[in-house]
Amino acid sequence: MSDWSALHQLLEKVQPYSTAGGKVWIKVLFIFRILLLGTAIESAWSDEQFEFHCNTQQPGCENVCYDHAFPISHVRLWVLQVIFVSVPILLYLAHVYYVVRQNKKLNKQEEELEAAHFNEASVERHLETIAGEQFKCGSEEQSKVKMRGRLLLTYMASIFFKSVFEMAFLLIQWYIYGFTLSALYICEQSPCPRRVDCFLSRPTEKTIFILFMFVVSVVSFVLDIIELFYVLFKAIKNRMRKAEDEVYCDELPCPSHVSSSTVLTTIDSSEQAVPVELSSVCI
């Protein structure tokens, strides 16, 4: 659990395609969660079961009481939380790489059409088709990526699910443990012969870490909500600006938004019609 380098490298690759809020969220996730989990927190819980003692000699009673007191370790719960909140942003990164790869194919098709020698109007129509595909995917020239179209929807979905997972794990922790640990745990589970007292190791230190991780989770959740509203506001603003620009579409050339699978007809050197299919480039 102490080696998080692979996850950190993947999250670092997301930063160029994220907003300022997304970059801050990644820093908070790595510095205040992953780094702390791999060092101080894991060592603080290393003796969790070994130092859990009950004032009874009944065989099996201590193990049953420990299992009832800690259905899942705090450390393992936080590890699951880190994994779950990281998955949506990694899926967004996969979509970014897909768009970049497909954008290269579109650019290649565009170069081939420009180099072809046939009707100029047909070439212009085909180039507009490619431009429409690039716009829907959120891609631009030279394999650059702009957050728009389906890529923007993927990013907004990743933020939404991150916030859902953050809140879900906060509620799970509150339901199972609360946010403090007491030095004394009273157990009445079978096969204990009577009501027994069990004692936890370093409850104050662990309570401090629990509260710290709670604050970090709340901060991450707030960052997700702020970023979601920011991206939504920018998307609505751009949509309104686009609606205003459509007034001038009669005078200015506007890219055509066509379906993701369009069959084109080109003319080769012998003036024979050749069908060319633009494959779907977005998911």
From Swiss-Prot:
Q: Which domain of life is it from?
A: Eukaryota
The yes or no answer to whether the keyword Transmembrane is present is: yes
Q: How does it sit in the membrane?
A: Multi-pass membrane protein
Q: Which Pfam families match?
A: Connexin
Question: Which UniProt keyword terms apply here?
Answer: Cell junction, Cell membrane, Gap junction, Membrane, Transmembrane, Transmembrane helix
This entry carries the following GO cellular component terms, namely: connexin complex
Task: Write down the InterPro entries for this protein, in alphabetical order.
Answer: Connexin, Connexin_CCC, Connexin_CS, Connexin_N, Connexin_N_sf
Query: What sections of the protein cross the membrane?
Result: 24-41, 77-99, 151-173, 209-231
Subcellular locations according to the entry: Cell membrane; Cell junction, Gap junction
Q: Which GO terms describe its biological process?
A: cell communication
The residues exposed to the Cytoplasmic compartment are 1-23, 100-150, 232-283
* Ranges in the topological domain labelled Extracellular: 42-76, 174-208
Give the family per the record: Belongs to the connexin family. Alpha-type (group II) subfamily.
What is said about its interaction partners and assembly? Answer: A connexon is composed of a hexamer of connexins.
Q: Sum up the protein's function in the record's words.
A: One gap junction consists of a cluster of closely packed pairs of transmembrane channels, the connexons, through which materials of low MW diffuse from one cell to a neighboring cell.
Protein name per its UniProtKB record: Gap junction alpha-6 protein
- Species of origin reads Mus musculus (Mouse)
Gene of this entry = Gja6
